[in-house]
């Protein structure tokens, strides 16, 4: 916790029955826990940190998630909008800070009407591309009334409903080529990666047929 996310913590307190908030002693632990959650559940992990040094401490765990291709959304606080750019109270250029680790998507919510769209896109991109995304929320924006749905006017961005995961299906030609390669091998070893996720039984069957060892 910190004054950069007081508004978010207040909202989480009100939503305690819907959102499980786990407080840690160090922001780095929060990022590693979010990464671990993603690894063991297959769902998006989320971590929250205050502005300045708090946000910086997330980086180690977020790079672990990015390099292991795990979906994690980092939500960080920032100084009030009128203070940004003035080096006020440990202000850090968070867009630049997170631009590498969350290069697929890092955005600042400057108006409550943005919140639904930005949060939605952060989760969709993290899950679809199995990467890290980051949402930055100035502390004065956190205290404004929520806008449940953006206005229906020019320039407003709306989000969809639901999420359909993409499925990669190899062509018959690719399957036949792989089968031929495996059949011709004398000592076959299988090195599996993220592409074999949710296919444990299939991998076991292939390994049993070929008498192959499996490593990941």
Region roles according to the model:
Residues 1-216:
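N-terminal alpha/beta PP-like core and its mobile active-site loop of ThDP/TPP-dependent enzymes
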């Amino acid at each position: 916790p910190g004054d950069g996310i007081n508004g978010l913590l207040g909202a989480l307190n009100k939503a305690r029955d819907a959102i499980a908030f786990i407080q840690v002693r160090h922001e780095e632990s929060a990022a590693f826990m979010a990464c671990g959650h993603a690894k063991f559940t297959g769902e998006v992990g989320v971590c929250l940190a205050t502005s300045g040094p708090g946000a910086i401490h997330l980086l180690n765990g977020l790079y672990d998630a990015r390099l292991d291709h795990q979906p994690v959304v980092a939500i960080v606080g920032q100084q009030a909008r009128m203070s940004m750019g003035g080096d006020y109270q440990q202000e850090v250029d968070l867009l630049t800070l997170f631009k590498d680790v969350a290069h697929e998507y890092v955005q600042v919510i400057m108006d409550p009407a943005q919140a639904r769209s930005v949060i939605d896109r952060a989760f969709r991109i993290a899950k679809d591309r199995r990467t890290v995304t980051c949402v930055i929320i100035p502390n004065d924006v956190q205290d404004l009334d929520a806008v449940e749905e953006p206005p229906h006017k020019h320039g407003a961005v709306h989000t969809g409903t639901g999420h359909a995961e993409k499925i990669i299906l190899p062509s018959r030609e690719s399957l036949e080529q792989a089968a031929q390669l495996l059949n011709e091998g004398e000592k076959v070893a299988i090195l599996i990666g993220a592409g074999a996720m949710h296919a444990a039984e299939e991998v076991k069957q292939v390994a049993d047929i070929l008498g192959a060892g499996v490593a990941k």
